[in-house]
Swiss-Prot record:
Protein name: Probable GTP-binding protein EngB
Residues the record lists as binding Mg(2+): 39, 61
Protein's UniProt keywords contain Isomerase: no
Chain residues that bind GTP: 32-39, 59-63, 77-80, 144-147, 178-180
Purpose: Necessary for normal cell division and for the maintenance of normal septation.
A single MF term (Gene Ontology): GTP binding
GO cellular component, one term: cytosol
Cofactor: Mg(2+)
Length: 203
């Protein structure tokens, strides 16, 4: 059976909260530092190579990008963060926008925080997970580019990050490895997101 996420289509890009769709559906947001592989995750999940643009210049995503899965069910690509070439004023605008989104958006059903498995749990990652915790939302910590490490190193990093997350958030954050290249962890993430959005598998 194919995943309903494969039906995703671009809907809109929003620079302010006023441009967001009506707040009466269900949506899952994807957050991550610039160059963590967020666009590749979205493209892999949907089996669409060009759904989310993979920029050669990290930090270019300057808005919330909405993709429609089914009517009133969305995937949301949040602005990448933490890249030095982005002007300070723009970083402040993003932060204000993201703060407002997390505190006001009732349609939000869950958060996927994308982290490069070689550089996990930066300050921004913890901040995003804290947002989810404060709202009582489920969150999935995604250790991407897992193919860059051997199985032993993957397991070691996974356990280390799990211990750190437990210290900060008790057992409220789920964690998994993921690779767009080998498709490792794709089915696991499909299941998580489909459950959050209340989607049924397509025969």
């Amino acid at each position: 059976m194919s995943s309903p996420l494969e039906c995703a289509k671009y809907l809109l890009s929003a620079h302010t909260t006023h441009q967001l769709p009506a707040d009466d559906g269900s949506e899952v947001a994807f957050a991550g530092r610039s160059n963590a592989g967020k666009s590749s995750v979205l493209n892999t999940l949907t089996r669409q190579n060009a759904l989310a643009r993979v920029s050669k210049t990290p930090g270019r995503t300057q808005q919330l990008v909405y993709f429609t899965v089914t009517p009133q069910r969305y995937l949301v690509d949040l602005p990448g963060y933490g890249y030095a070439k982005v002007p300070k004023e723009l970083q402040i605008h993003w932060q204000t926008f993201i703060d407002s989104y997390f505190h006001q958006r009732q349609a939000l059903r869950g958060l996927v925080v994308v982290m490069d498995i070689r550089h996990p749990l930066k300050e921004y990652d913890l901040q995003m997970l804290a947002y989810a915790r404060q709202r009582g939302l489920p969150a999935q910590a995604l250790l991407t580019k897992a193919d860059k490490l051997g199985r032993g190193q993957q397991a070691q990093t996974l356990q280390k990050v799990r211990n750190e997350l437990t210290k900060h958030f008790a057992d409220h954050i789920n964690i998994q490895t993921f690779s767009s290249k080998s498709r490792q962890g794709v089915e696991q993430l499909h299941t998580v997101i489909e459950t959050w959005l209340g989607l049924a598998r397509l025969a």
